[in-house]
Amino acid sequence: MNGVLNSMRLHSSAWITALFAFALFAVVSFTNHILFRTYALDLGLYTNALYDYAHFRFADTSLFLPESKNLLADHFDLYLMLFSPLSWIFKSYTLLVVQCLAVIIGGFGIYFLLNENERTRPYRIWGMAMFYLFFGTLAALAYDYHSNVISAMAIPFFFLMVNRMAWGKAFALLVFMCFGKENVSLFLFFVSLGLFWKYFKVKESRKYILLFAVFSLLYFLFMVKWVMPTIAGEKDFVHFGKYPVLGGDMTAAIKFMIMHPFEFIRLLFVNHMPEDPTYNNEKVFFYLVLFVAGGWALFARPWYFLMILPIIIQKELTNQP
């Protein structure tokens, strides 16, 4: 308790910023929920799953699929089990409350990360406030819940622990983030590669970050090649069907990217669904918005581009835009 009070006294401006941010998030998120403007997939589905987990039952896919399977076969998300006891208190608002609080905590991660360096320390509050007011942050909270958001809010703390060479804490955060959803571990593989690039000249950092990359990749492969197909009773990871342009399964996707690298790059910029001309210029607009929203900084810190590469690929090549 004394530690919290000391933190509030030493970093009072950060706590005040976080308080105002939470009020804003609550107005956006809770108001939409009150007015029935929140989304059934995933918020409604996962709220139902919370109820099942809170009553010691496995959740299933019967709400959105004709064939009922364990919900973990769709996304291996362990956060819902962790948060399920809170549903006894917050009811249908549980995941919205958790998501808003997670973003607030993520803002503190940015604050303390900027506080580490004398050059960036004067901008710590500005960085925190910009994160809270960023349109992507507000959009994530507006009408839905995704466990990816919870995982992403641990990223600044992960960066902080890597910067401090606190490898045990960094690994604990890595494992926590992997528990959010199976595809988060693939993202963390690229995050680790980006950090490997950034800290390449530091031998100790290089060694541990490479281990983090290996762990993330093995976790991803273990989940999508064995655990989830086994739970689903399928031969392969079901969500690869959303990427027919890559071949429809992991092996075909990897082969396509290796054998046709220029075509793969081209598809990231053009409409890969020519039967629907609605999307003809959407990818170009996306990159323009990304550039204006801060993507220009990737030219100065290119390792961050490596980190977000799987997110761009997942967004641009799906047949469910």
Predicted features along the sequence, with ranges:
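Start-transfer (signal-anchor) and selected internal transmembrane alpha helices
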Residues: 1-27, 115, 121, 203-214
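Hydrophobic, aromatic-rich transmembrane alpha-helices
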Residues: 2, 264, 271-308, 312
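Transmembrane-helix signature of polytopic, membrane-embedded enzymes
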Residues: 15, 104-136, 152-153, 169-172
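Loop-to-helix entry region of an early transmembrane alpha helix in multi-pass inner-membrane enzymes
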Residues: 81, 89-108, 125-128, 277-281
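Membrane-interface transmembrane helices that cradle and orient dolichyl/undecaprenyl
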Residues: 116-118, 150, 155-169, 196-203
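Transmembrane-embedded, aromatic-rich helix segments that form part
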Residues: 169-198, 209-213, 306-307
